[in-house]
Structure formats: structure tokens, C-alpha cells
Amino acid sequence: MSKDALNLAQMQEQTLQLEQQSKLKQLVNEDLRKQEESVQKHHQTFLESIRAAGTLFGEGFRAFVTDRDKVTATVAGLTLLAVGVYSAKNATAVTGRYIEARLGKPSLVRETSRITVLEALRHPIQQVSRRLLSRPQDVLEGVVLSPSLEARVRDIAIMTRNIKKNRGLYRHILLYGPPGTGKTLFAKKLALHSGMDYAIMTGGDVAPMGREGVTAMHKLFDWANTSRRGLLLFVDEADAFLRKRATEKISEDLRATLNAFLYRTGQHSNKFMLILASCHPEQFDWAINACIDVMVHFDLPGQEERARLVRMYLNEYVLKPATEGKRRLKLAQFDYGRKCLEIARLTEGMSCRKIAQLAVSWQATAYASKDGVLTEAMMDACVQDFVQQHQQMMRWLKGERPGPEDEQPSS
């Protein structure tokens, strides 16, 4: 009896499981059917949307094409839009070139008194006040030359200033002579005396530019022509790139740059004045010589000029700092006038720059001392050292063999 009851219970349990599985399958099938219906509805809705959009676009396009006024207005609008975009692009480029030509400093310019955009943004008050408070300076202020050369450069300064006042054509000048004789300083003073801007470039910067040299040269003169005050363009070491094209071995890029320079300086201008400085003017191309109006020789200072230079630099680098008391520097008591004359006699053959370096060495020697006092003996030691260095440099320059004190003992 119990066995039949157990079998009956098992059969009922199996029946219940089958019923549950059947219901579960029905639920799964119902979910699948609903999902399939949802996908079909979404697909049908998407297709209907595409058909409606296509119909709407087609009808709109058909209406647009058949309406001549709308077509004309659209074409005109697109044309104006294209012209506007093209004009804006080119106007931006032109504006950039204009700003660069007017205010940007060319890559060849090492130093200039013209106000650049960067300097104006960094120090606007300082730049404006410098321009408003600037006054013409004496062309020979801080420049020591022989009496004949002083008269010559003063005449040039008067001529240049009057040319600027009367808006005449500037003359091209060649300053030649040994290095350190005051050519660059005179060019700066000439610009300030005449109320002009100045720009300094060096000939050694041209050759490394290669193919960019021609473009840089044209940018330089385009920039020079925009100066309202007139520009004095000073080319230091001009012989570095203005060499003879017929005999010198120069690259094609440098030759093209030289041709561009000759083209821009072939005629006189009321916008810029050209000053060339060279230690070897005999190396110039003949076309450069034809462009030069005035030649001025800056020679080494004589004994009288050296005495003036020694006094000037002694005052600038030693006496003035010592009297101000702001630095650790004092000067012993001795006859300064006699010492300046003695030093002028010993420094024969030295340039203005060398004498300035000698005065700087006096200052450095005083700073190196324990008490900061520059004595006469310390000055004499510096002078003797500079004289020996100058003699050695002259031996190198002349190609002479070193003296007995420099020769090595034979083995």
C-alpha cells in the first residue's frame, strides 16, 4: 500500500514538473513573439520615416528647382560666402605682412632704435616716454677722433640732418679702417643727432641664411622704407658678404643675396641711409663701390687722442664709481693727468676699444684687491700686460715668428 502511494506521488511530481516546463516555454515563446513584433514595428516605422523624409526632400527640392528666384538667391549667397572666406583668408595674410613690415624687426637686424611690437607690449610707458623725450644729441659726444676727422664727420652730420629736414635723398657712406676705431659708435650718434632711427646688421649673418637670404634682404629694406623718421641702416663687417662676384668663390645663394642688396641700394632714397663699415674695403664688389657717395677713413688714435681716451675711460670706469660710493672701489692719490699722458705714450697702436678694455681691467683689478683701492702700481701692471698682449697680436697679424721669449728650447 505504501509502495503504490509512493509511485503515485512520484507520478504527480513528474506531472507537475511537466506542467511547469510547459508554462515556462509558453512564457518564453510569448516574450520572443513580443520582441519580434516590436522589432518589426520599429523597422516599419524607420522605413516610413525614410520614405516621408525622401518625399519631403524631393518635393522641397522640386519646388526649389522650379522656383527661379530661390535658385538665384541661393547661388548668389553661396558665391558671396565663398568670396568672403577667400577675402578673409587673404586679408589676414596681408594684415600679417603689413604688421611685420611696419612693426616687426627683420631677422637680419641685430639692434635697432625703432619700437617693435614686442617691446611696445612689454614696456609701453617706457617706449612712449623714450620717444617723446628723445632729443638730438651731439654727434661727437663720447667719440674721440683726430681734429681733421672730427671736422669731416661733423660736416656729414650737418649734411644728414639738413637732408632729413628738407626730405632730400640720403647719401650712402663707407666707414673703413681698423676695428675698434669708433665706426659703429659714430653711426649711432649720427642717427640720434639727425633725429633718425638706426638699425645695425652684420655681414656675417647673411651667408648662413642660404636660400632665405634674398627674402630676408627684401624684408629688411621693406621694413626700412616704412620708417617715418628715416632709418640709418648700418652694415658692420660689410665685406663678409659684399665680396667680388668675379674673383671670389661665393655660393649661388650668397650671390643672389648680393644681387638683391644691389637692387635695393642702387638708387638714393629719402626713407633710409646706408652706412657700410669694413676693415677690408678692397674686397668689395665693384658695384658696391659705385653705390658709395662718401668714404671716411677711421684711423687708429694718435697720442693726443689716446690721452683723451684714457682720461675719458678712467673717469667712466674708475673715478665716477669711486666718487659715487655705491661700489667697493677707491682710487689712490697720485697725479692722474701725468699718468694719463704716460699711458697714452705706452699704448701706441691701440684702438679706442682696446683702451676702453684697459680701463675695464683697472676696475676689475681694484675689485680683486683686498681693500678695493686702485693704486698707480696696479695701473702700471695692467698697462704692461696690455702692451705685451698687443705686441703679440701684432706679430700674429704680420705673420712674424715669435720672439725669443716665446720660442721653445730645442731638444
From Swiss-Prot:
One GO cellular component, as annotated: mitochondrion
Record key words, sorted: ATP-binding, Nucleotide-binding
One BP annotation, GO: mitochondrion organization
Lineage: Eukaryota, Metazoa, Chordata, Craniata, Vertebrata
Species this protein is from: Homo sapiens
List of residues binding ATP: G177, P178, P179, G180, T181, G182, K183, T184
Coiled coil: none
Similarity section: Belongs to the AAA ATPase family.
GO molecular function: ATP binding; ATP hydrolysis activity
Short name of one Pfam family: AAA
Name this protein carries in UniProt: ATPase family AAA domain-containing protein 3C
